[in-house]
């Protein structure tokens, strides 16, 4: 027996040693490899700020600092090598714009140029800024910048004439798509004298005052001017004469006159140039391009003006998002090609290829029972009509859906007009007559749109005819991608695991070198939770049975797992609360059972008012405290507490979860024993409170910033809608999502007729919504009133639980 016991202990010890060695060889090297791969960007609500911060840490062309790069120098974003001696771009700027517009241009579009970008400013300009600045001798920042423009062209000629094929004069408030510009210029012969840009003749008021002969023009300077090497070679030797013989104060007019006079060419007469070199002609000129979801923005090579740097970054971010969309679409096409070729090659299709490569069809998802059928929503240009439980029958089109429709229509029109030139016609979008939409969670969004279009024929017999067409569209979901919220540090990971565990005192020191992890032991110390403390505020008056259930859930969710929370019960002392003594006694029992738990009762005087209670409770905390406004008829999980922390950002974002509300169990289960599981989510058991805002995670500082609760609101309702409106008006972000970790447990609803009429109406509406689903109520009515109705045809489906 002793030998057998020793063998058993040796087997256990050998298993432990082998397990630790394998963990050391496999887990930690992988973690170290991830660390060496470089830090990953955080997927936080401050995504845009993080990107700007990263950009602000990047330097320029002088010293060791370099600008923020979207891809390595000398490489194409599509993966191929780039010719870095193709295009030279000279950007005209001024000393006062070096730190703003010039830096924004350098950190955004300049990295896409297949060549060199330099910024030209006045003599004596600050060259310590993180961009390549050229101070032009004898030039100041006076406006109009005629001398600056000519001297910049001379600098290009003297230093780079034989090094680049094309030369561009640009403003510091322009945005240039380097890849599209390269494709356009490579279709032309740079050996010929070519002068490119948006053709200009002057404004209506300037007609006849620019010294232009009939048939003469100039290239407008705002969207950018491009000239071939031959034009620069012919013109620059005569710049002195051009400067002495100027007829207007317009710099671009005089450059065009000089080119026409000495290079023998002028700005190309082409309607297409107006689209490629885009100038924003809005009546209320604000100095930036506001509407980005526009086909003109997509077709253009240059965009002007964007005088405010934040709008330059906004435009650049949008262009990158379009690039990402194109790449995702390309991956979907490749998956479809893989599926197609696998049929011919008789090879096995991977699950991912089968999921993403399925051909477009409205029948990709095959429902097996009635409850699984995906219903369509009807839409017009302004409204969305829905039969989904919990949604109003008609609601206004929200901004996100309207933007999605605009983007879809824009893509459809681009596809329709792809070969408009060869066909001699162009089709313009007029409006959406009506349509249908639905979202298939497995595959993507689906649309059927009835479009009113204008058919314009410009070849042969010209004509304009209104036409209607049906468009059947699918936006396929691409592959799911996960991003680390934080970078993985192998040493920190091992340190944290060791701190939370005991030591391997029964192993030798040599073994500890191979095994950086430790097993739990008797010496482990109690660690205080590092999660942000959540202060749970519950207004309470009566409802003792609900309070007992709430405290049972609170014990299981927070007290036993030692969650970092504080419970504040806001107890009303009015005579209408007969359960006050029992509630105080229950809290005393829990404090005795859990002496280290942070729980308190805060008395509130007067008649019940949720707004007053939460205002009194929140006043006990500082501005950095995280508050959770809760109700006694809720149950929640530990996972929700983590989402409450993650989705609430001080000074930026408030979390308004959309909670699940149970229907009346007597109706749901038809007299049978109700399920004890509150977290059963089906159309039969409950509905999502899309228009309820009472459950909130918010920092005290943000509550103060928006103005707090309206304590004049008495009784039931309205205080949550009022707070939500204040948050929106204060400019803070609201994060809303279905929250599977919070459930409103059904209870009978009593609506006091003495309430304010608006509150009373809302209460009655809420009460009516809690009886049961529309389908089940209809079935109950049919059972009683229609003898021919057979419930056997109805399949209730399976209950999905969380």
Curated annotation (Swiss-Prot):
Spans traversing the lipid bilayer: 8-28
Per the record, ranges on the Lumenal side are 29-802
User: What Pfam families does the database record attribute to this sequence?
Assistant: CHGN (PF05679)
Q: Which InterPro entries match?
A: Chond_GalNAc (IPR008428), CS_glycosyltransferase (IPR051227), Nucleotide-diphossugar_trans (IPR029044)
Q: Where are the stretches annotated Disordered? A: 34-82
Provide the free-text tissue specificity comment from this protein's UniProt record. Answer: Ubiquitous, with the highest levels in placenta. Detected at low levels in brain, heart, skeletal muscle, colon, thymus, spleen, kidney, liver, adrenal gland, mammary gland, stomach, small intestine, lung and peripheral blood leukocytes.
Q: Which reaction equation describes what this protein catalyses?
A: 3-O-(beta-D-GlcA-(1->3)-beta-D-GalNAc-(1->4)-beta-D-GlcA-(1->3)-beta-D-Gal-(1->3)-beta-D-Gal-(1->4)-beta-D-Xyl)-L-seryl-[protein] + UDP-N-acetyl-alpha-D-galactosamine = 3-O-(beta-D-GalNAc-(1->4)-beta-D-GlcA-(1->3)-beta-D-GalNAc-(1->4)-beta-D-GlcA-(1->3)-beta-D-Gal-(1->3)-beta-D-Gal-(1->4)-beta-D-Xyl)-L-seryl-[protein] + UDP + H(+); 3-O-{beta-D-GlcA-(1->3)-[beta-D-GalNAc-(1->4)-beta-D-GlcA-(1->3)](n)-beta-D-GalNAc-(1->4)-beta-D-GlcA-(1->3)-beta-D-Gal-(1->3)-beta-D-Gal-(1->4)-beta-D-Xyl}-L-seryl-[protein] + UDP-N-acetyl-alpha-D-galactosamine = 3-O-{[beta-D-GalNAc-(1->4)-beta-D-GlcA-(1->3)](n+1)-beta-D-GalNAc-(1->4)-beta-D-GlcA-(1->3)-beta-D-Gal-(1->3)-beta-D-Gal-(1->4)-beta-D-Xyl}-L-seryl-[protein] + UDP + H(+); 3-O-(beta-D-GalNAc-(1->4)-beta-D-GlcA-(1->3)-beta-D-Gal-(1->3)-beta-D-Gal-(1->4)-beta-D-Xyl)-L-seryl-[protein] + UDP-alpha-D-glucuronate = 3-O-(beta-D-GlcA-(1->3)-beta-D-GalNAc-(1->4)-beta-D-GlcA-(1->3)-beta-D-Gal-(1->3)-beta-D-Gal-(1->4)-beta-D-Xyl)-L-seryl-[protein] + UDP + H(+); 3-O-{[beta-D-GalNAc-(1->4)-beta-D-GlcA-(1->3)](n)-beta-D-GalNAc-(1->4)-beta-D-GlcA-(1->3)-beta-D-Gal-(1->3)-beta-D-Gal-(1->4)-beta-D-Xyl}-L-seryl-[protein] + UDP-alpha-D-glucuronate = 3-O-{beta-D-GlcA-(1->3)-[beta-D-GalNAc-(1->4)-beta-D-GlcA-(1->3)](n)-beta-D-GalNAc-(1->4)-beta-D-GlcA-(1->3)-beta-D-Gal-(1->3)-beta-D-Gal-(1->4)-beta-D-Xyl}-L-seryl-[protein] + UDP + H(+)
**Which intervals lie on the Cytoplasmic side per UniProt?**
1-7
Question: Membrane topology type, per the record?
Answer: Single-pass type II membrane protein
Can you name a GO cellular component term?
A: membrane
Q: Known EC number(s)?
A: 2.4.1.175, 2.4.1.226
Major subcellular location class: Golgi
**Cofactor(s) this protein cannot do without:** Co(2+); Mn(2+); Cd(2+)
Give the location in the cell.
Answer: Golgi apparatus, Golgi stack membrane; Secreted
GO BP field = bone morphogenesis; chondrocyte development; chondroitin sulfate proteoglycan biosynthetic process; negative regulation of ossification; positive regulation of smoothened signaling pathway; proximal/distal pattern formation; response to nutrient levels; sulfation
Bias regions of kind Low complexity — which residues?
49-59, 66-78
Keyword list, A-Z:
Disease variant, Glycoprotein, Golgi apparatus, Membrane, Metal-binding, Secreted, Signal-anchor, Transferase, Transmembrane, Transmembrane helix
What the record notes about the co-factor is: Divalent metal cations. Highest activities are measured with Co(2+), Mn(2+) and Cd(2+).
Positions bearing carbohydrate: 189, 623, 796
The entry's family comment says: Belongs to the chondroitin N-acetylgalactosaminyltransferase family.
Q: What does this protein do?
A: Has both beta-1,3-glucuronic acid and beta-1,4-N-acetylgalactosamine transferase activity. Transfers glucuronic acid (GlcUA) from UDP-GlcUA and N-acetylgalactosamine (GalNAc) from UDP-GalNAc to the non-reducing end of the elongating chondroitin polymer. Involved in the negative control of osteogenesis likely through the modulation of NOTCH signaling.
The protein's name in its UniProt record: Chondroitin sulfate synthase 1
